[in-house]
Amino acid sequence: MKPTIADIEWATNIMNELFAHNFYTALRYEERTSTYSGGENHYYELGFDEWEYAESGYFRENYGLHFYRGETKGCIVDFNRQEWVIKVPFDRSTNPKCRRNEDGTSIDYCALEAEKYARACAEGIEECFAATYEAGEINGVKFYLQEFANVDEDSTTDSFYEYASEQVENYFNRDEEDEGNEELFREEIWDFINDMDDQERVIAVFNDHKNIRKICDFIYDEDINDLHSANWGFTNDGREVIIDYSGYKG
């Protein structure tokens, strides 16, 4: 799946509108200070939270757009156009927690995703990832298109739970007729889920995939991490895919 010229034109128009309304250019962390009984607390607050309310009325009314963000990138979604979402990278001016490259330049986490998707294609496991491509650049900001995938945390968590329960069954002395024992069993499952590493989460979701070992190796080699339930989604053709796979260099 690759974006068409019409898809790229749509994304370009949206980005032009964002800049025209000073939306993206203001997407920067501002240092704030709060006072409490013990003294002062310095923290950073992303203005995106404010703009989501201040600006979203215009963009939702005129374009049907919804805005989401993580630590490293922003995502712009039109739920009436469920083919692609627009992703824009954050840098240290957006989030001071983002690390720089060794040469001092900011890390483009969206570019990392596009590069890793290309390598996944070369490995023949691209169906496990939401397709990601660079779409253009405006005012020095590159933007990207990623295959639309609907996040369903409950479904992904169910996969984690099923996998974890099978593992816990191997060592837990379970008594299904003992209510207290069953409660302890369920607690042990959730503890197991909380301790699962990213490769285990991949196995939980892609357990029937013929290339599961190759996928796990790819996840490890590419430093793909933080695969919690909100970083998965379901594409229009029903595939469950990873939607945030740049890896976080915090």
Q: Residue locations for each model-derived region?
A:
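Conserved structural core of kinase catalytic domains
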Residues: 124-206
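Catalytic activation segment of kinase domains across protein kinase-like and atypical kinase folds
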Residues: 223-250
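ATP-binding glycine-rich phosphate-binding loop
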Residues: 3-81, 89-91
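Protein kinase catalytic-loop region centered on the HRD/HxD motif
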Residues: 214-222
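ATP-binding glycine-rich loop module of kinase domains
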Residues: 62-121
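Conserved hydrophobic "DFG−1" position in protein kinase catalytic cores
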Residues: 77-78, 148, 234
